[in-house]
């Protein structure tokens, strides 16, 4: 029976309640917390996650299709190269222990080669990783990052598009199936109670079947 490595990335931290964040940080299995850089208590949350053995990413707001507001400090396609790079440096400074960046929204920005070149250049200069959340099939980010020899990853599944414990548990089993076939898998969830309860229930059961939970940087790019 084959198992594999699983990285679970939890998005949108920093904007929610501190109580739920503390409970995610208390999970025994290593998680990767993607923290919005311009929300309150970002530094405290990042320090706590790191101290508890979890990995930290900057969850960088990026421009989506359709005009929805991605949040303060977002990267957009109408910014010049200098401004894009300034915003990335600023975001990285705000989140201690960050091992890289993932995109928050960003269906427009991640499809733009010029924009992504600036993002990836900043990461390469610092030996940081990029996770493409794949909010659009048109994203060029992952392929560009691989071509530039960055450590880059892309998600296999969103875990909690349906905010229901049983639905999320089923997605975790699906994710394990991918890891069993491919040797590794990346699942993205969010800082929600149903997600926390599903992880608490399913992760120990997957561990008994030989699956290993690791920070995202421990996967093969």
What are these regions (language model features)?
Residues 173-176, 183:
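Structured catalytic-domain cores with a bias toward divalent-metal coordination
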């Amino acid at each position: 029976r084959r198992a594999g490595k699983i990285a679970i990335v939890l998005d949108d931290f920093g904007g929610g309640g501190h109580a739920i964040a503390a409970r995610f940080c208390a999970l025994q299995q290593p998680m990767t917390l993607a923290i919005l850089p311009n929300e309150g208590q970002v530094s405290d949350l990042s320090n706590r996650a790191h101290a508890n053995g979890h990995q930290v990413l900057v969850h960088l707001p990026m421009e989506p299709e359709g005009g929805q507001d991605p949040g303060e400090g977002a990267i957009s396609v109408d910014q010049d190269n200098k401004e894009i790079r300034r915003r990335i440096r600023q975001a990285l400074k705000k989140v201690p222990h960050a091992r890289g960046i993932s995109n928050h929204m960003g269906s427009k920005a991640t499809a733009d080669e010029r924009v992504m070149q600036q993002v990836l250049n900043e990461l390469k200069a610092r030996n940081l990783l990029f996770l493409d959340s794949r909010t659009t099939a048109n994203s060029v980010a992952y392929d560009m990052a691989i071509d530039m020899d960055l450590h880059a990853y892309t998600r296999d599944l969103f875990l909690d598009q349906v905010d229901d414990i049983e639905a999320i548990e089923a997605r975790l089993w699906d994710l394990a199936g991918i890891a069993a076939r491919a040797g590794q898998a990346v699942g993205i969830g969010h800082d929600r109670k149903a997600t926390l309860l599903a992880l608490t229930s399913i992760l120990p059961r997957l561990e008994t079947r030989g699956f290993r939970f690791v920070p995202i940087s421990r996967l093969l790019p």
